[in-house]
């Protein structure tokens, strides 16, 4: 079995890495190759943000994985979640579209910028519709 673990920072997956045998990690590489029992694990460190995560994940997905898992805080600002909790995502937001005021995250709605969010969502839907027609 071959697994891809995606995380923004190495810090977020250090508990996992401590249980594995590190096979290779070049300083200029974003992938830490390791194993656990007979399972091959590639840990991809993307950097923070949805753009970095999408870009670097797309780069490694040309390899064949049996399972891909996004680990770490995954952009959440929910302090009620315990460290180590497993979360099933059924809805998502543009987490980076907002701001922090020093104490909390302010959404586009909080900032009274919902119209921009709506336009962005509509543009995203149009982009997805266009992409469906591209040859694979």
Regions inferred by a protein language model and the residue ranges of each:
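N-terminal beta1-alpha1 ligand-phosphate binding loop
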Residues: 3-25
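Glycine-rich phosphate- or other oxyanion-binding loops that anchor nucleotides, phosphorylated ligands
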Residues: 2, 26-136
